[in-house]
Each structure stands twice: as structure tokens, then as C-alpha cells.
Amino acid sequence: MDQKMINDLKEQVFQTNLLLPKYGLVIHTWGNVSMIAPNRQFFVIKPSGVSYDKMRAQDMVVVDLDNNVLDTNGLKPSSDTPTHALMYKHCPDIKAIVHTHSTFATSFAQADKPIPCLGTTHADNFFGPIPCTRALSDSEINGAYEHNTGLVILEHLKNNQVDVNACAAILVKEHGSFVWSNKNGKDAVDRALTLEQVAQMALYTQMINPHMKEANPALQQKHYNRKHGKDAYYGQDTKQED
């Protein structure tokens, strides 16, 4: 392995993990961010149970897609590592994953409810509702729990033909959210922050009007496509004249 590449990736993952408490997405030692190497042979993830204010870049743990620890500073990787590994193995577009127990998104997960698309804020960022997986069975919980968490995520994505680039988030029933990016860790955290915001908006909207239906499908399609479609026109061109 290229040690410079590993060190650079550790620094990126470290800095990105620090955004979770900064943005109010986690408390204590909850949550984690990982990023996969360009060759997709290994990924770097936050260590298990280490507080954010004591964590260092060199504490990030390097793991392969079969959960073998390749490089560590004497610390165990996040307990959610098998979930991340399975998603990287089966979703080649995913380059970074964020897992949190943020308040509003997790409330929907605990209620076994998808987050409906009720307006343009949601549609600008996620295509369609944010789905919620089925519950894990007792045998899945008592077996390889974190691996099985990954399996129920993949099961839902496959069975419902979810485009992981268009809807880059999922709720795991009774657990929390997993959010990902086809770009980098910072983008994945931004999406996790957006997920929390649209979950809060959805809850408040349903409190005001319990009978509120999802936003007009044409409006959803328009707002998603203008930012992410092949003819997207939101924002500035990459190259601009001086």
C-alpha cells in the first residue's frame, strides 16, 4: 500500500469525522464517516468509541472489504465497519459513507416510516422518499449484526430498485441513517446534514397537516433534474471567463 495515500486518506477521514459534532449530527462518540481508497481495495474509518475531541488523524483505521484491519494505531475500527464494507463491496459508485443517529432522521427510523418528499428542499437533494429498511430478525441481530445490517440495506436497495446516486440515504429500522456520496466524505456529511433538515421539515409539516400528501411528482422531478439531471442548470459553470 502507498503510505502517502493512506496518510492523506486518514487526514481526510479525520477532518470529515470532525464535521459530525460541528454540525450537530452526533453527540458523545456516536456516528462515523469512512472513505474508500481510489483503488477500492481498502477504506479508512473512525476508531470505535474514541471521543471526537481526542481523536487524531493517525487514529483512523484502515480496513479491507473483508473487514481485515490493515493499518491501525492500536485502536479497533468502528463497530459499524462490516456495514460500510458490505456497501462498498456491492455499490461501486459509493466513495464515502456517513452513519449517524441524528435526532429527526432517527425518529423516522424508529417509527418505521420513510421520509416523504413533501417539497422542493427534499427534491433538490434526494429523488423520492428516503426509504426505511425492514427490521432485522432475532437471528440476524444475534448473529453477525453489523454485517446483517448491511445486508438489509442492500436487500432494500435491490428489491426496490433504488438508484444509489439519486437517493443517497436510507434509514435502518429502529437504528439510524446511512448516507453516502459518489464524490467524497465532505459531500456525504453535507448530505447527512441535509437529510436531517428534510426529516425535521417533514415532521413539522405532518404535525401541521397530518393529511399532507407527497409533493407533485412533476415538481419533484423538475427540482431534482435542475440540479442533478443531464441538463442541470443550477449553479455556475465549472469554467468561467475572468
UniProtKB/Swiss-Prot annotation:
Origin superkingdom: Bacteria
Cofactor note: Binds 1 zinc ion per subunit.
Active site: D124 (proton donor/acceptor), Y234 (proton donor/acceptor)
GO terms under biological process: L-ascorbic acid catabolic process; L-ascorbic acid metabolic process; pentose catabolic process
EC numbers: 5.1.3.4
Keyword Isomerase among record annotations: yes
GO CC terms: cytosol
Residues bound to Zn(2+): D80, H99, H101, H175
First-tier enzyme category under EC: isomerase
Keywords: Carbohydrate metabolism, Isomerase, Metal-binding, Zinc
Annotated metabolic or biological route of this protein: Cofactor degradation; L-ascorbate degradation; D-xylulose 5-phosphate from L-ascorbate: step 4/4
MF terms in GO: aldehyde-lyase activity; L-ribulose-phosphate 4-epimerase activity; zinc ion binding
Residue sites binding substrate per the record: G31, N32, S48, G49, S78, S79
Catalysed reactions, semicolon-separated: L-ribulose 5-phosphate = D-xylulose 5-phosphate
Co-factor requirement: Zn(2+)
Transmembrane portions of the chain: none
Family according to the record: Belongs to the aldolase class II family. AraD/FucA subfamily.
Annotated NCBIfam families: PRK08193.1
Function: Catalyzes the isomerization of L-ribulose 5-phosphate to D-xylulose 5-phosphate. Is involved in the anaerobic L-ascorbate utilization.
The protein's name: Probable L-ribulose-5-phosphate 4-epimerase UlaF
Organism: Mycoplasma pneumoniae (strain ATCC 29342 / M129 / Subtype 1)
High-level lineage: Bacteria, Bacillati, Mycoplasmatota, Mycoplasmoidales, Mycoplasmoidaceae
